[in-house]
């Protein structure tokens, strides 16, 4: 049985990946400050042996872990955010993970963050992080390691979930660290053919609350030009409007002949009718990146427009349908958007010599 631990544990994508691989493991430690994420975590995996809320005040377990997983908040580096980088207090949480690695000395660690990390401060932030972690980087020895270096053999690569069997275009950078006494001949997993399309993750029966009204649909399809408003919220500028995204020749009742034709930007159909625009499917049948808002990508079902359900968003993160939650839709969307695509993580773990 391997011993595991994680910071910024969220709703347990790390646990899901281990379960998917059939690995017998024991959670020594998990950590997350969000009370709703903690609730969902416990609901699915039970209460860990040690489950602190704050990485600043948690005690580092004395027993060395086999795998340590960390995924600091990505908003500081996200291309979709303000990108304050290490000027954002969330951008320096890496150093808490670095401290954990230096003191606990896990056999392996996996670090995940947004692709925007690579270009923060012209690449200096990412280089500094690698210098703090690695005595070798992607197989190349570091000539003069920093005094603070954790002395791991470090490998990094940007991986896209659509290359690992999941119909979502989600690029993330992964850093894998391997301790000196472990087998440090590592290579990232090879890409896979995508055999699943966005239509394959849709639920058969969806509550009416996820649809917007016929009146609003008619208004949206009539509206062209520069800007328009729903509930006094400006949605977009020069937004293309078509009905060809996820199409089906049915209304709510029928479920046959679903297919994906084109992609575009559409108004996001939040419960109140407010919100910006949502990306729909791409021509290759993948979804744009699931985000943390409660106005997820919308889709056409016959002449109806609806947003993706929380279950569909978790499916796009490769969580199984056995995964459960009892939080609000708003929190469920946030939890899915903050998580890691399970199969990508599973493929990385599968390359480790556990």
What is the meaning of each model-derived region?
Residues 1-4:
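Extreme N-terminal starter segment of soluble prokaryotic enzymes
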Residues 8-11:
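Class I SAM-dependent methyltransferase "Motif I" SAM/SAH-binding loop
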Residues 17-26, 44:
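A short, Lys/Arg-enriched amphipathic alpha-helix followed by its capping loop at the start of a domain
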Residues 57-67, 74-282, 288-289, 305-306:
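Class I S-adenosyl-L-methionine
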Residues 47-54:
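Conserved SAM-binding strand-loop segment of SAM-dependent methyltransferases
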Residues 35-39:
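Short alpha-helix immediately C-terminal to the canonical SAM-binding loop
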Residues 27-32:
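Conserved SAM-binding motif I beta-strand of class I
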